[in-house]
């Protein structure tokens, strides 16, 4: 019965052939550190799943944001698990993406013809960093308040554009806008970059280690 179901699924989806083709692709030897790219992608998928769960309970306004987080953590079944998995997953994602970038840079895998792989990877790191910063702000507790204040003051130190950008950040700040950036704008940007990154990897393959 299982084989019949597999045959039925294979005819309609071709998933078996897809898996066989992926397993048959040649991978250069001694590229174990390259696995941090795949680990990062797996963590991104986990962040999506835990984030969708949190969407059902989080309230994006200053008066109820922290209360909704506390309710989810203390009253909802397994809410504490999903929240902590999301919180610690963000830190782990930042670490694995950075490790992947350092490995690629050290092995000079960014060189011709893989410059666009490197550029899209750097942009993905920046997007992940913005995910972490915006995620810290969303509970809107004392840590969120001072994190935003510190980042705004840091932006003000930028030459020429610092003060104008600081004013925009202060004048347009609302928890709801940060929430929309975190759950709509940044995910769209990240998955577009991921798609481009995977297309480039498919086109050029994995770089041979030096």
Protein language model annotation of sequence segments:
Residues 1-210:
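Membrane-embedded alpha-helical bundles that constitute the cytochrome b-like, heme-associated redox core
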């Amino acid at each position: 019965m299982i084989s019949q179901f597999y045959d039925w699924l294979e005819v309609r989806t071709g998933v078996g052939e897809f898996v066989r083709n992926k397993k048959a692709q040649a991978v250069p030897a001694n590229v174990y550190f390259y696995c941090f790219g795949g680990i990062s992608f797996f963590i991104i998928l986990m962040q999506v799943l835990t984030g969708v769960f949190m969407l059902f309970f989080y309230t994006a306004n200053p008066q109820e944001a922290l209360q909704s987080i506390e309710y989810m953590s203390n009253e909802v079944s397994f809410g504490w698990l999903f929240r902590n998995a999301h919180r610690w997953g963000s830190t782990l994602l930042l670490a694995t993406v950075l490790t992947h970038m350092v490995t690629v840079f050290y092995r000079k895998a960014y060189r011709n013809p893989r410059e666009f792989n490197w550029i899209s990877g750097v942009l993905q790191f920046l997007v992940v960093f913005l995910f972490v910063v915006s995620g810290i702000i969303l509970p809107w507790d004392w840590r969120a308040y001072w994190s935003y204040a510190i980042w705004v003051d840091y932006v003000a130190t930028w030459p020429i554009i610092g003060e104008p950008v600081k004013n925009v950040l202060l004048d347009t700040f609302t928890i709801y806008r940060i929430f929309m950036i975190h759950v709509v704008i940044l995910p769209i940007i990240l998955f577009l970059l991921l798609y481009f990154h995977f297309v480039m990897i498919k086109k050029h393959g994995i770089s041979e280690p030096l």
